[in-house]
Amino acid sequence: MWWTPIPEDIVRDPAAFRVGRLTKAHGLKGAVKLELFTDDPDKRFVPGAEFSLQVPDSSPWHGRTLTLTELRWYNSHPVGFFEGVADRTAAESLAKAILWMTPPADEPAEPDAWYDHQLVGLKVLRDGVEVGTVSLVDHFPAQDLLHVDTPSGTVLVPFVQAIVPSVDVEAGTLVITPPLGLFEEIPDEQPTPSATSDAEPGSAPEGDDAR
């Protein structure tokens, strides 16, 4: 079973973020298929881009970095070529590796864009009440998913504007407006027992004639 510690240089750099995962070798010349965690691959995967690797301690790539030489698309699927990865054997040894990078210091911040490390740990509010804490962010082609730890378990929340309308990193909070069924509904206040509920069996309510 793979256990992949986050590289030390990434742990020390709160601005670092995941951009992809190497899935499997492609062909015989060292190419590797990619699963992208970014919606802007043309910006992140440029020739010369350097990535830190999240791999097991036992991996021959542990503690090393990868430099991209070229990104190609085959049948709408991204395939990367990297320095020092010359054949299929080397490419196969990189399967499951997660790619991390640090944005340039002069890169302007994007509106309504957050890195994983900014979201993890945020308190999740629903109608002003804290319902859980973000523990993980999953990236998928269609949308990202927030793992929200609640007292009753983990809930997966689609990270879309309609469901997560507000993120306040400085305040440490994230507001959700989930659809019915995503979270357990808060039970309504129990109705006050009617006067007839405490009546003795067979007795008639006050004011009513016995029949």
UniProtKB/Swiss-Prot annotation:
Residues 184-211 are annotated as: Disordered. InterPro entries: PRC_barrel-like_sf (IPR011033), PRC_RimM (IPR056792), RimM (IPR011961), RimM_N (IPR002676), RimM_N_sf (IPR036976), Transl_B-barrel_sf (IPR009000). Residues 111-182 form the PRC barrel domain. Its main location: cytoplasm. One of its GO terms (molecular function) is ribosome binding. One of its GO terms (biological process) is ribosomal small subunit biogenesis. Coiled coil: none annotated. One of its GO terms (cellular component) is cytoplasm. Keywords: Chaperone, Cytoplasm, Ribosome biogenesis, rRNA processing. It comes from the Bacteria. It is found in: Cytoplasm. The PRC barrel domain binds ribosomal protein uS19. Belongs to the RimM family. NCBIfam families: 16S_RimM. An accessory protein needed during the final step in the assembly of 30S ribosomal subunit, possibly for assembly of the head region. Essential for efficient processing of 16S rRNA. May be needed both before and after RbfA during the maturation of 16S rRNA. It has affinity for free ribosomal 30S subunits but not for 70S ribosomes. PANTHER family: RIBOSOME MATURATION FACTOR RIMM. HAMAP family: Ribosome_mat_RimM. Binds ribosomal protein uS19. This is Ribosome maturation factor RimM.
